[in-house]
């Protein structure tokens, strides 16, 4: 199981993501603070920041941007993925400062990508929903879905594969084509319970078990 960081370190990263976005929306400046955790400056994992709007008891994606294979170090990747999620996701208008009180920040730390080199028909047997994220690549096309996505949608491995292909702007069955490369990875995910509130580490295996009941 990929868990490189403590809850204290994960909490720092989520707080950092929110703080740099608030600073950027207030002043237009991006500031990379110092870290009391040396690992965050030496590790170079992939990082994604996700921002979700709260609507009653439901959450709606507001922005998600990241670096699948890292950017300088975990600290820098968190800072710039947070700015990307708030203001550079082409699917959404830029986040407004007044929205900060009604959005949740989530930071996902990605393990190195692992290329699957088996018969594509065996992919559904290998992929574990609640553990794996997927990356599909073929020619100039690529698509990534984080491990929490199939859990939140309660997808089967086959549905997860199909939607990752679609994310790459490829046919839904592209994963069966041997010209398509499929990578799996794991992620450690830290999330706010409420806007600016307590941070916890998500347990996707338990979440997926609940969705199947």
Curated annotation (Swiss-Prot):
Domain AMMECR1: 8-201
PROSITE patterns registered for this protein in UniProt: AMMECR1 (PS51112)
Pfam families linked to this entry: AMMECR1 (PF01871)
InterPro entries: AMMECR1, AMMECR1_dom_sf, AMMECR1_domain, AMMECR1_N, AmmeMemoSam_A, Uncharacterised_MJ0810
Entry superkingdom: Archaea
PANTHER family: AMME SYNDROME CANDIDATE GENE 1 PROTEIN, AMMECR1 HOMOLOG
Protein name listed in UniProt: Protein PAE0745
Organism: Pyrobaculum aerophilum (strain ATCC 51768 / DSM 7523 / JCM 9630 / CIP 104966 / NBRC 100827 / IM2)
């Amino acid at each position: 199981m990929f868990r490189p960081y403590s809850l204290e370190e994960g909490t720092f990263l989520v707080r950092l993501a929110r703080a740099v976005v608030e600073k950027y929306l207030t002043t237009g400046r991006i500031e990379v603070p110092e870290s009391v955790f040396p690992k965050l400056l030496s590790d170079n994992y992939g990082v994604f920041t996700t921002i979700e709007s709260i609507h009653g008891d439901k959450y709606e994606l507001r922005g998600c941007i990241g670096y699948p294979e890292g950017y300088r170090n975990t600290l820098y990747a968190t800072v710039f993925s947070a700015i990307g999620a708030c203001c550079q996701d082409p699917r959404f208008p830029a986040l407004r400062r007044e929205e900060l009180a009604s959005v949740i920040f989530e930071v996902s730390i990605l393990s190195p990508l692992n290329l699957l080199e088996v018969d594509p028909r065996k992919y559904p047997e290998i992929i574990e929903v609640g553990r794996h994220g997927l990356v599909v690549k073929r020619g100039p096309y690529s698509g990534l879905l984080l491990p929490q996505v199939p859990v939140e949608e309660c997808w089967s491995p086959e549905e997860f594969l199909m939607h990752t292909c679609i994310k790459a702007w490829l046919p839904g069955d592209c994963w069966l084509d041997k010209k398509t490369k499929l990578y799996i990875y794991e992620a450690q995910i830290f999330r706010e319970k409420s806007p600016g509130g307590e941070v916890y580490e998500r347990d996707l295996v338990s979440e997926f078990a609940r969705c199947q009941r």
